[in-house]
């Protein structure tokens, strides 16, 4: 038994020595090679990030674009964007399935409808339903703010829920208001606040906490909402916050 243990220890050392030799051969040896490796790693990371983000961008930015430029009802905009998102998810699912099953051509096309029905549709429906109906209490400053969540415009709810997936520290400090709320906050009454319910019955604005979150986080969240088609403004009312609204 001792002889076996000795041989195993020797084999382990030889394997480690061979691994270190191969690593030295494969590892970049010059600054130019390290720079090239870093560039390839960055490109790979960006590709992965783009692949992950694309369905959410299609859903959120697509619904806002259709709503604003197509002059369509909000639920129609959500439905069309969800359909397009389902197409993206189906394409991903087909690609993954073909990689594992080695089915291509007509065999790959035969996967489209089953994967659309049993993978893409449930995922998109679940995500939209979750985003539109649920807000965790940890992301609302108070119970009244959370209670107002379903009164917020559906497109803003989709955008908020998607932002929360990435930034788990987002805190909504205000949603719907009444005219007399401004007096209680020591502010002049606003006649055209987007925090009021609009003619369509929805609240078109929310405020997000910025205190204690850091400049980069706040800037990233503001950039996200702006790129998704929302108006954003960082201002001081009763407290420093980020105002996000849908026109």
Task: Set out the residue ranges of the language-model regions.
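N-terminal targeting leaders characterized by basic, low-complexity, disordered sequences
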Residues: 1-84
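Short, structured coil/loop segments at alpha-helix boundaries
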Residues: 36, 40-43, 71-75, 145-157, ...
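Membrane-helix interfacial "entry" motifs
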Residues: 36-40, 106-114
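Catalytic cores and adjacent binding grooves of peptidoglycan-active enzymes
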Residues: 51, 55-99, 109-127, 189-247
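Membrane-helix boundary connector in multi-pass membrane proteins
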Residues: 101-105
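Active-site acidic/histidine clusters and adjacent loop/turn architecture
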Residues: 118-172
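N-terminal post-signal-peptidase region of extra-cytosolic proteins
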Residues: 147-159, 187-195, 229
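Active-site-adjacent substructure of cysteine-protease-like catalytic cores
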Residues: 167-202
